[in-house]
Amino acid sequence: MPDRRTILVPVFLLAQAALVHWAAGRERVPAPPALRSFPSELGEWRQLTEDPIAADVAGELRADQVLSRTYLNTSLDTSTLHSTMLHSTTRPAVGLFVAWFQSQRAGASQPHSPKVCLPASGWIPAATGEIALDTSAGAITVNRYIVVNHEQRDVVLYWYQGPRRVTAGEWAAKFWLVADALRYKRTDIALVRVVAQSGEGGDQAATAAATGFARSLYPLLRENLPRENLPREELAR
């Protein structure tokens, strides 16, 4: 016989979809953010490349806006900004990927968890957990996910960023999707992912690079993504 979790998970997902569809019948759909004009410099980080995603990936993702770039920490290496840095084991570079979804009501696409899409692409999970980040816009909790593919090992930070809060857990994101659809008629969300390759410095150095970039990224991203028109103190970070 199937275990209780096997039965409850599909039931929950069906109930969630029904509630979101019902609640979003008069959905407040925000205007898309201008992600293409997102700053090329974030503190000590400078954009190195624009990294368009493949057409088949875009078709599967079905996001309304996508930002995919590589940034270099110029305070760590100011010698030159050429592509060979991307393949150096000591490169102070991170990959940024933001997928923004205007609506998650029935029939619309939803964010794909990196814990699903990365293993499906051949990456093997090595460690997972959550870490807290202090930023100039407040403290947030994000996922730290370490994956391996042949000789490459990456530290991945990711989170779900909505108009009212940042959420790390997938199930928490689903809960707040329903709650915010019921209360505020909003279902827009962004999946934010920061990737740093583990090189000679190992996971510790890669985590330091990823968290350093995320601290610079979050305040600017918070101001660029659609938010509720409420006093700042009423908005959950």
Walk through the language-model features, giving the residues of each:
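Cytosolic-side transmembrane helix boundary signature
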Residues: M1-P2
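Hydrophobic membrane-insertion alpha-helices, especially the h-region
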Residues: R5-H21
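Alpha-helical transmembrane signal-anchor/signal-peptide segments
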Residues: G25-L42
